[in-house]
């Protein structure tokens, strides 16, 4: 049986008390947030965001401030959506018993501070020197008093001191407590009215409830969305039927023909007009650099060069630059062959000339393969053949008087069973010897 003194509904006095306190000591954001919690017992954070239209960071700052002052409490609940996903939500509510205790504590703390300030601000005389700005209290009056003149003079500059008006207490300092009690009297009256109120646990720790205004707006939005879906369903179905097919979206057909590449590119090249060659390719930029005598001394095969140039497309018959490069190449090759074949001593001057010519030819001519490369290639092939022959040697093992290769016997265990004891010992000894040779 429920206690008749326990209230199952929040009294109006408690709601007015919360409104008075929040409007007297907090800003407008805190007032709006607490008004929602006064009208609704327990509100989710997302619902408060939708009602107040605050930024999430701003709303959390306001709620954390109220929660730090013990005006509201927070409860976290884990909810499971229709798709099975769990989410955490914060629910805020007002614990009115804690609210009353916090208001009493803060008001008492303010009253005690005012009394302390009033007690400390007694009317004690204070003196100040107008020249050196030294200050003195009433306890130092015996040091300041001059019996000859009957005035108070500074102990440093002997100037007559004046009473410090800035150190005087405020005119309303003694009436501050009376003004405080007068202004806070409505809150005191509400506290006396709610002194013996006993609230039920369902009021102190309420369960989450749905806000009617938000529920109606959600229902209207769902109804409008359903009506729009029914009205536009036919059009969407027709649009989807007319849409393209994406079955072959990732299907690509690529044909690679390596034999007929020239035939494929020839029509495109034939359709384009041949570009005119620049003058520095048609005519030599070096006039008279090399004469016919130098070409003869260099041993250049002019006929071979001309045949090669005629085979190429375009007017490259009289390219002096290519001839100069060939002259350098032939000169370098002839000097190298003559020095190696004749083994004749060469002076330092000739050596310097040949080095300069070689450096110039290396800069201008393309690299040439070495003459000793083919013998080296044959030697590598001979070494590979010898290694192959060494690896190919397979020892012979006797099985019942018949010769078999060692690898064949290793792959066929039934041959081992046909061996005589002497043949088996020879087979085992050969395997051990091959194993030792392998790791030496």
UniProtKB/Swiss-Prot annotation:
Start and end residues of each HTH TFE/IIEalpha-type domain: 14-104
Binding locations of Zn(2+): 129, 132, 154, 157
Region Disordered, residue ranges: 333-395
A GO molecular function held by the record: RNA polymerase II general transcription initiation factor activity
Family: Belongs to the TFIIE alpha subunit family.
Function text: Recruits TFIIH to the initiation complex and stimulates the RNA polymerase II C-terminal domain kinase and DNA-dependent ATPase activities of TFIIH. Both TFIIH and TFIIE are required for promoter clearance by RNA polymerase.
Protein name: General transcription factor IIE subunit 1
Organism: Mus musculus
